[in-house]
């Protein structure tokens, strides 16, 4: 695998499409909502967490299968379905950043193991070579940062 360029994206107001179902997809949807993206979720079924986000107006849920027009105006797409290859091709034509879960050849970006604590965000990646090591490193970071974050102002003298 080639070198992946680490980047933190400002997704506020950007249309992001999510296709698929399951616990991991629900986590991705929540992460996009937390990043203030405009989330469009396309799938006949949804996890309870996604249903709640849709009911609260934080996610637009289309209760159907993917259609090519769903990619129009998208900045980013996350997919986990039988059509990963086709959706990747269509996304590439539109210059949409795409991630197909557990399908590296159909990804333009990947998710690292992420630790968030207030304004501190640490993302760790092994380019898919050792995911367990990335998780272990995230856990170590969590324990280390718990003592040091947030930074304390110097004492007043």
Regions found by a protein language model. Name each.
Residues 58-60:
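Short, conserved active-site loop motifs that form the nucleotide-linked donor/cofactor pocket
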Residues 7-29, 155-157:
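Glycine-rich adenosine-cofactor-binding loop
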Residues 128-157:
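An accessory alpha-helical subdomain
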Residues 1-11, 111-112:
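A short, basic/flexible loop-to-alpha-helix module at the beginning of a structural domain
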Residues 63-68:
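Conserved SAM/SAH-binding loop
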Residues 76-80, 85-111:
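ADP-ribose/adenylate-binding Rossmann-like module
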Residues 36-40, 74-82, 120-129:
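Short beta-strand and adjoining strand-loop segment in the mid-core
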Residues 27, 35-53:
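NAD(P)-binding Rossmann-fold cofactor-contacting core
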């Amino acid at each position: 695998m080639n070198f992946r360029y680490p980047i933190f994206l400002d997704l506020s107001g950007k249309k992001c499409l999510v296709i698929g179902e399951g616990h991991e997809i629900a986590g991705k949807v929540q992460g996009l909502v937390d990043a203030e993206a405009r989330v469009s979720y396309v799938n006949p079924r949804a996890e309870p967490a996604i249903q709640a986000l849709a009911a609260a107006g934080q996610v637009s849920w289309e209760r159907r299968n993917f259609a090519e027009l769903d990619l129009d105006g998208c900045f980013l797409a996350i997919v986990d379905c039988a059509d990963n290859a086709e959706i990747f091709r269509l996304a590439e034509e539109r210059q949409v950043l795409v991630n197909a879960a557990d399908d590296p050849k159909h990804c333009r970006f990947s998710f690292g193991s992420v630790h968030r604590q207030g304004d501190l965000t640490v993302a760790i990646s092994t380019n898919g070579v050792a995911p367990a090591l990335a998780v272990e490193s995230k856990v170590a970071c969590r324990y280390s940062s718990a003592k040091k974050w947030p930074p304390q102002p110097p004492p007043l003298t």
